Amino acid sequence: IRYIPRKKTTSASVKPAHEDKKENPRREFLSFAGLLAGTALLKAQEKKVDGGLAVIEDKKIPNRITPITPPGSLSASNIAQHCTACQLCISACPNQVLRPSGNLMTFMQPEMSYERGYCRPECTKCSEVCPTGAIHPITVAEKSSIQIGHAVWVKKNCIPLTDGVDCGNCARHCPVGAIQMVPFHGRHRHRGGRENSEQDKTIMIPVINTERCIGCGTCENLCPARPFSAIYVEGHEHHRII
């Protein structure tokens, strides 16, 4: 028989098992909170500067009279009646166009907005996943002829008029050719030197063919004006076939 001496442990040096169990969730929570805070900080830094050269200002949502609903939903009343707010269409949207509505009448049902992307003509993801018929399945060809809204030009926000520089971004990127740039002659603000000045100048401004526009939001999303776009989409209560 052999005896091996062991160091005596005091009650202060040994923590009860139930204390460890209490501390573990606390550590996990603090770690998770730290991770979220770090992620949020990185996102904020990404938004603040563009390559360290210029400050980025986020776009603000325009005040639309009529909300925009996805192609295939037929009308605002149809989607309000049949949508169960399951969020499948919002999750499936690859362009960050769909988001849950904050309106009490249509709470958590999908609503379209174009600050972060636009509704690409070749995408029909939301119509493929809807399980209730709130958004009917449509083909790419059908989508190109569905008018869910129309573009509206806001003169006071347009960069050629506010800054005296050429733009035309909306017309260049419109997938259906619904926007044309036309000459406009008048006194326009010109940024140069130390002070802003006005001078007579012919500039190009956009004109919208509302009969041809399908409301995809390409123009609104790609408009460089901040915080509000110089062109935005107003929704249609009932979708039209053009």
Predicted regions span which residues?
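Non-ligating segments of multi-cofactor redox enzymes
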Residues: 1-242
